[in-house]
């Protein structure tokens, strides 16, 4: 690219140069994204998940279903009244010992 002194250019020329740089950056970004998606599809690690739009609430956040609290063998979940640490461990079935 040729060297241009920016002090001698009027605003129209500066805007034209800025627009050209802007368009080049956008085109390079879009082309790079297209190549990344193409490679992901060809290599098999591009997966799309389609969600039913009826279950999407405000701001596109999926509703969370309460499946109950899980219990860990050596501790209790915070907020469970009266449950202290459980010291007994489960033994494996006899065929695995």
From Swiss-Prot:
What does the function comment of this entry state?
By binding to ENY2, interferes with the nuclear functions of the deubiquitinase (DUB) module of the SAGA complex which consists of ENY2, ATXN7, ATXN7L3 and the histone deubiquitinating component USP22. Affects USP22 DUB activity toward histones indirectly by changing the subcellular distribution of ENY2 and altering ENY2 availability for ATXN7L3 interaction. Regulates H2B monoubiquitination (H2Bub1) levels through cytoplasmic sequestration of ENY2 resulting in loss of nuclear ENY2-ATXN7L3 association which destabilizes ATXN7L3. Affects protein expression levels of ENY2 and ATXN7L3.
Hey, which family's this protein in? Belongs to the SGF11 family.
GO annotation, biological process: regulation of gene expression
Q: Where is this region: Disordered?
A: 76-97
Q: Which residues carry this modification: Phosphoserine?
A: 92
Its main subcellular localisation, reduced to a broad class, is cytoplasm
UniProt keyword Phosphoprotein, yes or no: yes
Q: Where in the cell is it found?
A: Cytoplasm
Q: Does the keyword Lipid metabolism apply?
A: no
What are the protein's UniProt keywords?
Answer: Cytoplasm, Phosphoprotein
User: What is the name attached to this protein's record?
Assistant: Ataxin-7-like protein 3B
Subunit (UniProt): Interacts strongly with ENY2. Interacts weakly with USP22.
Further information in the entry reads: Encoded by an expressed retrotransposed copy of the Atxn7l3 locus that emerged prior to the speciation event separating primates and rodents.
GO CC annotations? cytoplasm
């Amino acid at each position: 690219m040729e060297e241009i002194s920016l002090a001698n250019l009027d605003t129209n020329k500066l805007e034209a140069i800025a627009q050209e740089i802007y368009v080049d950056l956008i085109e390079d970004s879009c082309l790079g994204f297209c190549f990344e998606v193409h490679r992901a599809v060809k290599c098999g690690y591009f997966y799309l998940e389609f969600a039913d739009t009826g279950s999407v609430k405000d701001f596109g956040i999926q509703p969370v279903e309460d499946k109950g609290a899980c219990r860990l063998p050596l501790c209790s979940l915070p907020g469970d009244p009266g449950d202290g640490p459980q010291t007994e461990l489960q033994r494996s079935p006899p065929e695995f010992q």
